[in-house]
A protein has these predicted regions:
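Membrane-interfacial catalytic/cofactor-binding modules of polytopic membrane enzymes
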Residues: 142-144
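Conserved beta-sheet core of the metallophosphoesterase superfamily
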Residues: 109-113, 120-127, 133-138, 147-243, ...
Length: 253
């Protein structure tokens, strides 16, 4: 899950996207006979004011965003729970949720971290939703074991080059099967130095900063089906948000 903060006043759009995503996940789970669901939120849940262009386009302040996105995800997890034996949630903060510009910001102080804290309290009565099933290496990465294989989760803002794969394995202090990331606003599956790299897209797609920097983004998420041998299948989940919004002919003059 990435970029669900209602930073453009589009909370209803994101809610409908999450509902569509939920249906896709359930259909895929039924097709493959899936037992457990691992939800990884790899950052940028909250849109802070890290760039002037983002600050201008944010229509909701960060407090409204934290409450709004936390409620969206808690509803999403609660609706997933009847369809799986266990739901495991893991997260790492993204660069969009930092409090200051990159050169001044601490990697240990990001607004995304408040979302998981909120979710734990909100969903404490759901016995099959777990938040402590992963190992936090530091505030920028975590490890989650799925069917005997270790998956390393990062946001990706520190890990853009192929050479970082070996560095991440060294920091994990164990062989890593796959690296899960986000950051670049589109889905991508690759294999680098024998390690799978799985990058998930963004509910938002492109923000004003992406447009200005000519950074490609697509409104999409990713579902992976994992077995004891690793990733058996993956699915691109694309969203056409034009179907969620009033068309020009539907808007009263």
């Amino acid at each position: 899950i990435r970029d669900v903060a209602p930073s453009r006043g589009l909370g209803d759009v994101y809610k409908r996207q999450l509902q569509d995503y939920l249906k896709e996940i359930i259909d895929i789970a039924d097709l493959h006979g899936v037992e457990n669901c691992y939800v990884w939120a790899n950052g940028d849940l909250i849109s802070g004011n890290i760039h002037k262009s983002i600050a201008v386009s944010n229509r909701e302040n960060v407090i409204e965003q934290i409450v709004g996105v936390s409620e969206l995800i808690s509803e999403f997890l609660s609706e997933l729970s009847p369809h799986f034996k266990n739901i495991y949630f893991s997260s790492v903060a993204g660069n969009h949720s930092r409090l200051e510009e990159k050169d001044l910001a601490s990697p240990h102080e990001r607004l995304d971290d408040l979302v998981e804290w909120y979710l734990k309290a909100r969903l404490q009565n759901f016995k099959n939703i777990a938040f402590d099933n992963y190992e936090k290496i530091d505030d920028t990465m975590y490890l989650v074991n799925i069917r005997g294989k270790d998956y390393l989760g990062v946001h990706g803002d520190y890990d853009g080059s192929a050479s970082k794969v070996q560095s991440l394995q060294t920091m994990a202090q164990r062989p890593v099967y796959a690296i899960l990331s986000g950051h670049l606003h589109h889905n991508k599956i690759d294999n680098v130095q024998g390690v799978k790299t799985v990058m998930a897209g963004s509910f938002l797609g492109m923000d004003d900063y992406c447009v200005g920097k000519r950074i490609y983004g697509s409104q999409q998420q990713l579902v992976c089906v994992c077995t004891y041998t690793g990733i058996k299948a993956y699915y691109d989940i694309d969203f056409d948000t034009s179907i969620y919004r009033p068309q020009r002919s539907d808007i009263a003059a």
